[in-house]
Amino acid sequence: MSTKKQKRERLQKAREETAKREFKYTTAQTLIGIFALALMFFAWGSHLLPVTDPVESNYALTAKEMVLSGNWLSPQIYGHFWFDKPAMVYWLMSISYSLFGFTDFASRLPAAFCGAATITLLVWYICRITKNNVVAVWSGIMLATSLEFWIISHAIITDSMLMLFTVPTLLSAYIGLMENNRRHMVIAYFSSGLACLSKGPVGLVLPGMILLIWCGLMRNKKLFLRLFPWQGILIFFITALPWYAFMYAIHGDPFVREFLGLHNIVRATSSEHPGDNHFYYYFLLLPFSLLPWTGLFFYEIKKQWKEKTSFYLFLMVWCFGTLLFYTLMATKYVTYTYIAVSYTHLT
């Protein structure tokens, strides 16, 4: 009798393993399909959008000089070194130029790629966290078709790269903290390192602030202890430090003054556009950024308020923590709170 029972258990276990493998295969196939569709959605017609002045043209010219000069470490424009942003945006554009030539399409392809990759990652993470494929796919569809995400997935700026790496930074950190999963914490730190190579210290500072606030609200000391694994900290420095160390070794104080000083500290403490320096700036901008899903966003916030799950609280801190962080900054840009947009489609 026990032998028959053991056989049934082994058979059931084999079926479960087979189903698990098939689910992973199907999920991989689905994610590849989502990425391909999203890439076509964002890249379609990009060749009809000429590079605009002055912001897009500066990025495009810097990437072009990177290809022509062969210097892929020190960004330069008009023959002079330029420390406006880290190298990630120029690397991606330079790869695109090397493959497709110096065209408008090649200039915008990295943004389309990052937008598609962000959608794909979002779907995977939501499926992983909620165990609901329908919710995950709809989250991706809503984000892809929201106004600001669509625009920035066509724009030649660094925000699409920052979004791509901030999503896994925060969502892997959430999984790692809730499940005590060291692997996901390492992924979070690795992604944060890539975010710092995309737009500077904000790739670490903002996610770090969000996670610390959320851990505090959860009132769980174990979460704080899990937040700083030495493996994650090590992989962060291995990822982000080499380029910064190289730039300082080659360019010295001018790099520190212009990149960390002018383009980070000065913008945070002194407004470049005083006319936009209003405390309500981003709170007015957010509803327009979410179109056509604005109404659904506010409905879901109200609907889920009663339950207040750990994930819901995490998303609330993500959104409003981002808005508050940039509201306190002196310089305000339309795209600064872009990473808050991804939160709104997770609710």
Where are these regions (language model features)?
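Membrane-integral, polyisoprenol-dependent glycosyltransferases
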Residues: 29-346
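Terminal, Lys/Arg-rich, intrinsically disordered segments and adjacent short helical elements
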Residues: 1-23
